[in-house]
Regions:
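A generic structural motif
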Residues: 13-15, 26-28, 76
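Short, well-ordered beta-strand micro-motif
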Residues: 12, 26, 86-90
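Conserved Nudix-box catalytic region and its N-terminal flanking loop in Nudix hydrolases
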Residues: 18-61
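Short, charged, solvent-exposed linker or helix-capping segments at domain edges/interfaces
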Residues: 96-100, 115-117
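Charged phosphate-binding loop/patch that engages nucleotide di/tri-phosphates or the phosphate backbone
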Residues: 113-137
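Conserved N-terminal beta-strand and adjoining loop/helix that marks the start
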Residues: 1-22
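Active-site-adjacent beta-strand/loop module that shapes the phosphate/pyrophosphate-binding cleft
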Residues: 5, 63, 71-96, 104, ...
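Structural detector for helix-capping/boundary residues
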Residues: 8, 39, 53, 106-109
Length: 137
């Protein structure tokens, strides 16, 4: 059995209600695919730290970590098995991204339609109630 490669990613959002927007980025490996920022977990880094870091590197977005979303998603790519834990991030600041991806802030329903994979669409639906919850002081 192949070794599973752990990864982490961020489901970043801003606004609420009608102004709720979801962050998507283009995939570097699959042209035309829209995904959430994600990537490898560095040595000594937690999955949550990696999710925040990947979101900043790939999209230039930082924010408040609100915790994991769902169970890790598993997929096979190029002969390897990957397991990705996504984390919900309330965006608080933006800067230029460092890896040249196209980014988009989309209304919730448009983000659902543009996501390239059903499992990430499911996670976005699962996360929505937490996006609409009032901020805690």
């Amino acid at each position: 059995m192949a070794v599973t490669v752990p990864q982490a990613g961020g489901i970043a959002f801003r606004g609420s209600g009608r102004s709720l927007s979801i962050l998507l980025v283009t995939s570097k490996k699959q042209a035309g695919f829209w995904i959430f920022p994600k990537g490898h977990i560095e040595h000594g880094e937690t999955a949550a730290e990696a999710g925040v870091r990947e979101t900043e590197e790939e999209a230039g977005v930082t924010g408040d970590l609100l915790g994991p979303v769902g169970a890790p998603l598993e997929y096979d790519w190029a002969g390897k098995r990957y397991s990705v834990q996504y984390f919900l991030i309330r965006a608080t600041a933006e800067a230029p991204a460092s890896d040249g991806r196209t980014i988009a802030w989309l209304p919730f329903e448009e983000a659902l339609a543009r996501l390239s994979f059903d499992d990430t669409s499911r996670l976005l639906r699962e996360a929505r109630p937490r996006m609409e919850a009032p901020r805690r002081a």
